[in-house]
């Protein structure tokens, strides 16, 4: 490609392809401001960067909602918050056999990472429920040794972060959701963003790989999205899941406006240029909102996705996603 035909800001960003070094905040802000007509040029660059500097292949993971609803936090997008009024199934922490059944199904469909997710604030200290989760992790390691076991169980303290590391957790997910300075206004004010960031730091000190990303479509600006990407870089996270809001009836964001497709493409491309070596996953919104365009996101810098369903909304069939991955391989 003759980069002289590109917008100058995109042409300058081709430096990432040659060096593997990320773009600066100023460059990201300029690229974020470009009109939608340049989104595909940006996506093309991001895909090339992914192929040259990414981890290689397509990284699929699946999660299980192991404890649902009655969460005391007031996250505005979440169906599980007791502050909201969504119609969802509510249940306490499931038993080990139920977890093993779901995990085995994922492994049989070629999914390499399986995550246990629980509703609620988290586990700053050891308690009986947290010890049950540790036992589940041990059981999965014993029964399915080839499966990478992950967890997303909220805010942690030093004791619980160290325990998860000892029990061999592969990745821990806790999302920033938005730029740190916008968290209280756009997401929740029953807890602070610093608690989430400190959880990431605790886990990194214990040597645990962290999966940490955000959600778009909750009222943030494009500048806010860029700020979130750079906050993630400062936290040294290895996997970045990006969710697109799926409005759920009974939540404050049930009538939120959809994010333009060109902006979604731009966010994924910028994520790759800010994080050339990380795994960038497309999570919520892939099937329901992107529909025919979900493959485009996987060619805009993403190299992974969440498969098989989400916490309170349905996803796509595991077998369909397995075929999807095989077809995407021809672009690598």
Curated annotation (Swiss-Prot):
Residues 53-283 form the Radical SAM core domain. Pfam families: BATS, Radical_SAM. Pathway: Cofactor biosynthesis; biotin biosynthesis; biotin from 7,8-diaminononanoate: step 2/2. It catalyses: (4R,5S)-dethiobiotin + (sulfur carrier)-SH + 2 reduced [2Fe-2S]-[ferredoxin] + 2 S-adenosyl-L-methionine = (sulfur carrier)-H + biotin + 2 5'-deoxyadenosine + 2 L-methionine + 2 oxidized [2Fe-2S]-[ferredoxin]. GO terms for biological process: biotin biosynthetic process. The keyword Membrane does not apply. Binds 1 [4Fe-4S] cluster. The cluster is coordinated with 3 cysteines and an exchangeable S-adenosyl-L-methionine. Binds 1 [2Fe-2S] cluster. The cluster is coordinated with 3 cysteines and 1 arginine. InterPro entries: Aldolase_TIM, BATS_dom, Biotin_synth/BioAB, Biotin_synthase, Elp3/MiaA/NifB-like_rSAM, rSAM. Its cofactor is [4Fe-4S] cluster; [2Fe-2S] cluster. SUPFAM superfamilies: Radical SAM enzymes. [2Fe-2S] cluster binds at residues 150, 211, 281. [4Fe-4S] cluster binds at residues 71, 75, 78. PROSITE patterns: RADICAL_SAM. One of its GO terms (molecular function) is iron ion binding. The keyword Metal-binding applies. Keywords: 2Fe-2S, 4Fe-4S, Biotin biosynthesis, Iron, Iron-sulfur, Metal-binding, S-adenosyl-L-methionine, Transferase. Its EC number is 2.8.1.6. Homodimer. Belongs to the radical SAM superfamily. Biotin synthase family. Catalyzes the conversion of dethiobiotin (DTB) to biotin by the insertion of a sulfur atom into dethiobiotin via a radical-based mechanism. This is Biotin synthase.
């Amino acid at each position: 490609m003759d980069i002289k035909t590109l917008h100058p800001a995109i042409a300058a960003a081709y430096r990432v392809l040659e060096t593997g070094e990320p773009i600066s905040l100023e460059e990201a802000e300029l690229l974020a401001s470009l009109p939608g007509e340049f989104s595909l040029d940006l996506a093309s660059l991001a895909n090339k960067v992914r192929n040259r500097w990414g981890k290689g292949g397509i990284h699929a993971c699946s999660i299980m909602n192991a404890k649902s609803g009655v969460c005391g936090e007031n996250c505005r997008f979440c169906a599980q918050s007791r502050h909201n009024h969504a119609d969802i199934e509510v249940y306490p922490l499931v038993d080990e056999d139920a977890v093993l059944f779901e995990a085995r199904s994922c492994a049989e469909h070629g999914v390499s990472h399986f995550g246990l997710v629980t509703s609620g604030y988290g586990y700053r200290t050891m308690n009986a429920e947290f010890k049950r989760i540790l036992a589940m992790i041990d059981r999965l390691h014993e029964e399915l040794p080839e499966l990478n076991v992950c967890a997303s169980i909220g805010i942690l303290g030093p004791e619980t972060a160290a325990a998860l590391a000892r029990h061999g957790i592969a990745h821990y997910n806790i999302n920033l959701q938005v730029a740190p300075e916008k968290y209280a206004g756009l997401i929740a004010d029953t807890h602070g963003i610093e608690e989430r960031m400190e959880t990431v730091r605790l886990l990194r000190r214990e040597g645990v790989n962290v999966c940490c990303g955000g959600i778009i479509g909750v009222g943030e600006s494009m500048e806010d999205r860029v700020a979130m990407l750079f906050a993630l870089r400062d936290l040294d996270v290895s996997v970045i899941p990006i969710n697109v809001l799926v409005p759920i009836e009974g939540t404050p964001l049930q009538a939120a406006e959809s994010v333009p497709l060109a902006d979604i493409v731009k966010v994924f491309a910028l994520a790759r240029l800010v994080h050339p070596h990380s795994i960038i996953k497309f999570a919520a919104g892939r099937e329901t909102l992107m529909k025919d365009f979900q493959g485009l996101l996987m060619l805009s810098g993403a190299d992974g996705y969440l498969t098989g369903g989400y916490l309170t909304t349905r996803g796509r069939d595991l077998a369909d996603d397995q075929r999807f991955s095989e077809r995407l391989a021809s672009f690598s």
